[in-house]
Amino acid sequence: MEKLSILTERQQTELNYAIIQYLQPLCQQDNHALLDQLSKILNIDQWTQESNNVEKVDNYLEKRWSTVLRLQKKIIDLENEISNLNNIINSSNSDNNGIVLSKDKINWIPKGTAKQSYQCENIVTTVKLHPNLPLVLNGCNDGNLYIWNISNDDNTIPEKMIKAHTRAINKICFTYKKPYYLATCSSDLTIKIWDEKFNHIRTLNGHEHTVSSIQFSPIDNSILYSVSRDKNIRVWDIFQGISLKSFVGHSEWCRDLDIVSSDNNGDFVLTCSNDQSARLSHASSGAGLAMIVGHGHVVETVKFLPALQANKILDEYITKNIEQFPTIPLELLKDKTYNQLGFKYCITASRDNTIKLWLIPPPKIAPHRPPLPSKYNNSQSWMIAELRGHSSWVKCLCVHPNGRFIISGSDDKTIKFWDLSSLLETGSVNVVKTIIGHDGFINDIDFARLKEASDSTPTSQEDLLKEVEKRMRCLFISGSADNSIKLWN
């Protein structure tokens, strides 16, 4: 019985030619008779001549074989990805705290297995996902800037490596609007600006000590903010290359900052320091508007909480437990000034191993004048909750795009995901996921920025959540003192 072939007649002919082509250079002079015999078996009588029907390609069999291997690897990768996605769908996404997470994309958190890992020669000090492209950037303590392409099969070789600074790179940030300029700051006292193709275009000098952190204005690509060990907060025009303003915000080393923009009142700067405090300042005037005091050690990082979900959850929690907050006027929670400002709550992380959540008193807003310190609580912020779970310094924070989850990285080598909504159920912000994968301190984390906004402007929270879900990029990275960057699945 004749065996059925899975190949077409043309494919069979191409395969036969490829076999002869592969064997020809391997055969010695005295083996040519054997090769002739094999050619007849394969119905290739003139294997040394070009065929009119079959296109002859050099090293055809080897190329086909390597293609099969690549496809097999790709299939395995896709099967693993499907398995991980199925696990996410089938899992209830619950922890020992009994908090059940939604299976919707809006509440996506990584399962805890690294999809890819990138290894550097030195300690990774900072990481950042590109706002638009599939690129991971990281800075190291030797001053090198690495750029990795997520879509590359080979994750051992960076897309690009730049000797950006002479000492450690402490922070990387991108502009919020196209074109996406990049800024890096360093312990060499400088800030460097890079274009979209990562060409160096300008160096900003002015700080007298380590530049700890930087961030662009959300509404103006030309404006960059920086904080330093020299205690100064500086405002830069990156195109002119000049410092527009400098003011002292703290009595000791300024560690980190976060920026929020208001349509009518410009930018507001939230900073933290070795003096164990955080401070809200008005960028244009440099005026201090509110203080955050309550940590027992260096405050490493600060973040504004977005209004999406967080405001509603925290307002409800305070209202239901107002007896715990006797100095917070209930009418303050409904103060419309917050709508003008673009901020209400913030979080801080410290070397005292805790994360604290704060209600910021609103500054006084007057027409044609810069904002003034708040009339409430002597301009002191109210601590709403304390997040305990890390066993060592909490070094980095980021906020999930949905505004509900807080993500923290610590010197205890763990990354934790905290659910604000658990406040309403248990009275505390509980951990819903702990990721363990690094062998060293977690120095930085980053959740991918949302895709570019559409022209529509959602108004209700439900519509806002749908818009965020549509624009979400489910990518999360971490950088560690173990010299690695991990992209989490």
Curated annotation (Swiss-Prot):
Pfam families: WD40
Keyword terms, alphabetized: Cell cycle, Cell division, Coiled coil, Cytoplasm, Cytoskeleton, Microtubule, Mitosis, Repeat, Transport, WD repeat
Coiled-coil region list: 66-98
GO biological process, one term: establishment of mitotic spindle orientation
Any one GO molecular-function label of the UniProt entry: dynein complex binding
CDD domains for the chain: WD40
InterPro entries (UniProt xref): Dynein_regulator_LIS1 (IPR017252), G-protein_beta_WD-40_rep (IPR020472), LIS1_N (IPR037190), WD40/YVTN_repeat-like_dom_sf (IPR015943), WD40_repeat_CS (IPR019775), WD40_repeat_dom_sf (IPR036322), WD40_rpt (IPR001680), WD_LIS1/nudF_dynein_reg (IPR050349)
Main location: cytoplasm
Cellular component, GO annotation: cytoplasm; microtubule; microtubule associated complex; spindle pole
SUPFAM superfamilies xref list: Lissencephaly-1 protein (Lis-1, PAF-AH alpha) N-terminal domain (SSF109925), WD40 repeat-like (SSF50978)
WD repeat residue intervals: 119-158, 164-205, 206-246, 249-291, 328-368, 389-428, 437-486
Subcellular location(s) of the protein: Cytoplasm, Cytoskeleton; Cytoplasm, Cytoskeleton, Spindle pole
The protein's assembly and partners: Self-associates. Interacts with NDL1 and dynein.
Job description of the protein: Positively regulates the activity of the minus-end directed microtubule motor protein dynein. Plays a central role in positioning the mitotic spindle at the bud neck during cell division. Targets cytoplasmic dynein to microtubule plus ends, thereby promoting dynein-mediated microtubule sliding along the bud cortex and consequently the movement of the mitotic spindle to the bud neck.
Similarity comment: family membership: Belongs to the WD repeat LIS1/nudF family.
UniProt protein name: Nuclear distribution protein PAC1
Native species: Candida dubliniensis (strain CD36 / ATCC MYA-646 / CBS 7987 / NCPF 3949 / NRRL Y-17841) (Yeast)
